[in-house]
Structures are given as structure tokens and as C-alpha cells.
């Protein structure tokens, strides 16, 4: 028996969806434990592209149960839309294959309105929010004002909580943000309709997961975003509002730490970032544009072009430490096919002195200079390779060097977007 957590080891968009899709073959349950529809997983199966924002990637596999844990914040409209799209494609024929924790917090219209209005007023201090209400929903969760899914299903409780919250939110919208107030009747009617649709998916998912573990079933925990976007360990305040690290898999599902056996970090063979915040290896030249265009580095959720840079070993080494990674899956190695020379950031300097770890102080981090090591490119197409030993020697040397720098074994190498374009070195479920 093995239960595996998959986390992003950089700033998100590392290719977790594909890796989760591959590992799902070996799992019984696939569990989402944090975030909301601010993350997009792009999967290519038999040439068909599917983008999921809330529902775990495992839904594309028959016989698997997908669970959305209590650490997620749920937009009912988006969730229902994803269900309908999957059913149109012939997926999710059995509704019992998808469960949602009764304790998830619900994204309300005022959360989205506040999110967008705040970002619009922040000028050059923008965080880079997707505007989907994720942060304000987590604010209400921590402030003990949130509306949970179990509340939405109880007409009396939902009406009371909505009325109380809307009084405060409309004050904020009108008096502080200069926006129009929202209508209680409109929200109540719409969300009561959502409740009727959602009811059949709701469950005590913590209990179900723990029973499955006791029965010897294998669980795969699917993280969203990345380690450097973690609200505690990331480049605060340019972070998301949830715990993206491996520890979030426990708090976000109700499964204890001793039932986690493997933690796999996902890292690109280079690095990208969306939105504002420090990025020491960012490339603003032709190399950066080549990475962006070749790698298709545009957000699955927003369509925004991603910032691109050379592989940063400091970032991934940090992710290895704070997550306790047992392995790293390296994605998009093929994007580097045409480079004559490839750089690796092996460390930073600040004011001319070496930096031991990622600075928590943003003012320091923003002034860190990367220390580069150069390696020759392999200048050949590797997408047809299926065994590590069949990669060009220079590609193998690159992977081995990254492994040395991050002090963690690389257990998988992705060389294209397709499920079959993968080299598995070690299976964490084996």
C-alpha cells in the first residue's frame, strides 16, 4: 500500500495534471486538497485536450473515485459546468465517482466582486490574482464567517448566513471599493438552485478516505499551484491563499500524516511564474521568449503569458526541504531541445555575498542575483524516447546535474504533453 502526495515544486504550472493523470492508474482515490478554480490542469489523452479547474484529474479514468477535500474552496457554478462538460464527453457516467466534502467553503459572488475591485485599486502593487474570489473566500474561512457546503444545503442556515454576510460585504463594496451592492434575492435564488444539484455529491470525505486507507486502498493527493505560492512558505505576499505544500494534504482532507508514504514534487526543466513577485532567473530576452513559445507558457485559467527563466536549483531545493520530497518529476525537458547552451541557477548572491536559502524578506529576494552554471544543449528531438538511457548523453547529464543540485532523486521525466511521452524511472506506488 502507498499513498502519494503530488505537489508543485516551483511557482505552479509545473505539469502536475499530466503526472497525476499517469499516477492515477495506480490509485483508487484521487483527492484534491486545497485551492479553487484559480488553478488549471491541462491533460491530453488520445489527442483530446481537457482542462480541469476543480475536479481532480483522475476523473478521466474509469473506476477511480475523485474526492474534493475540505481544504478546497468551491465555486458551485464552475463545478457544475465542469461536471456537464465531462458528461458531454462521455466521462463521469457514475455520479458516485465524484464526492465533495461537506466542509468545503463556498465561493460567493461578493468574494469575486471584492477580489476584482481590490486588484483594480491596487495599482502597481497588484498581487496578480485571477479574480475568482479565492482569497476573499479563505479570508472568510479564517475569520469564521464562511458559508460551507453543509450550510448551503440547509435553507434556513444558508438564508441567515447569506443575509449576515451580505450586509457586511455590501458595506465594503459600496463604502470602501466604490462598487454597486449585490442583491440578496438574486444570490439566494441562484445558490439555492446550485444546492439542489450538488446535494448528491456531498459526503463526509475524511471518514470515507480513512476507511479506504484501512481497507488497503491507494490514495493520490493532488495539489494545486506550487510550493513558492504557499501562503506560509512562498514569496509572501505574492502567494495564493492556501497551504500548497505537502502538509496541506493532511489538513485539507482529514487524513493523518502517518498515512502519507511518498511525496513527489513536480518541476519543469526550467521555471515559470504568473503574476508579480521575485523571480531571480527570469529571462526578458530571446531565450525567455523561446521558452514561452515552445513551452506554450500561457495560463490554462487566465490565458496570461507566463514569465520564463532558467532552472532555479535554489527554488526546487527549498521545495525538497519544506515538503519532505521523496522524488521529483521533471517535466517539459523537450522544450529545451533547440538550445545551444542551457543555464542552471546553482545559487544566489545578495550584495556580493552568497545566499544560503531562499530569503523570506521580499526586499532581499528581489535583489538576489543568480549564480549560473552552463551546460551544452543536446540539439535533438527527444519526444520519441521512452527509456532514460536512450536520451542523448547531454540530456542525461543535464538531468543528473539537476538531481545533484536539488539533493533529491528524479523519478520521472516528461518529454511531451501526451500521457505516453513519459520516462518513468521509479513508480512511487510500486
From Swiss-Prot:
- Keyword Hydrolase present in the record's keywords: the answer is no
Tell me which Gene Ontology terms the entry assigns under biological process: 'de novo' AMP biosynthetic process; IMP metabolic process
What is the reaction catalyzed? IMP + L-aspartate + GTP = N(6)-(1,2-dicarboxyethyl)-AMP + GDP + phosphate + 2 H(+)
Checking InterPro entries in the record gives:
Adenylosuccin_syn_GTP-bd (IPR018220), Adenylosuccin_syn_Lys_AS (IPR033128), Adenylosuccinate_synth_dom1 (IPR042109), Adenylosuccinate_synth_dom2 (IPR042110), Adenylosuccinate_synth_dom3 (IPR042111), Adenylosuccinate_synthetase (IPR001114), P-loop_NTPase (IPR027417)
The record, for PROSITE patterns, names: ADENYLOSUCCIN_SYN_1, ADENYLOSUCCIN_SYN_2
Q: Which family does it belong to?
A: Belongs to the adenylosuccinate synthetase family.
Protein name as catalogued: Adenylosuccinate synthetase
- Recorded source organism is Geobacter metallireducens (strain ATCC 53774 / DSM 7210 / GS-15)
Per the record, the gene is purA
